[in-house]
């Protein structure tokens, strides 16, 4: 699913990493915990499960997590990562919130 940087441009690769981390690690973790925030340990446990199941390098997912913070989909405060407040209704409904929906909600003023 994830390609090396040489196969795609820098921006396409970053977007793909963000999409993967959001869809496979972060959003399922949020729904599993039924909470707007998670710790680094919780993220790492979920990431390790997904990476071993899908045979993905952990480095790809760490870049995706940082990228989600840069896009302000995830916010980091001390040792907690939390989702943007506009995504909380999706969590409460246990709705599917793909990356496109998340980025759209965050960018709405």
Task: Describe the residue ranges of each PLM region.
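A short, conserved structural fragment
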Residues: 69-79
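Minor-groove-contacting beta-hairpin "wing" of winged helix-turn-helix DNA-binding domains
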Residues: 79-86
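Short amphipathic alpha-helical interaction segments
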Residues: 54-70
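Short alpha-helical segments that sit at the start of domains
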Residues: 1-37
């Amino acid at each position: 699913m994830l390609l090396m940087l040489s196969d795609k441009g820098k921006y396409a690769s970053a977007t793909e990493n963000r999409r993967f981390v959001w869809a496979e690690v972060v959003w399922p973790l949020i729904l599993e915990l039924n909470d707007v925030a998670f710790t680094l340990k919780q993220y790492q446990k979920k990431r390790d499960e997904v990476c071993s199941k899908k045979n993905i390098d952990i480095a790809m997912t760490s870049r995706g997590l940082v990228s989600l913070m840069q896009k302000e989909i995830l916010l980091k405060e001390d040792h907690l990562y939390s989702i943007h407040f506009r995504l909380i209704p999706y969590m409460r409904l246990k709705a599917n919130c793909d990356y496109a929906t998340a980025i759209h909600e965050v960018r709405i003023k």
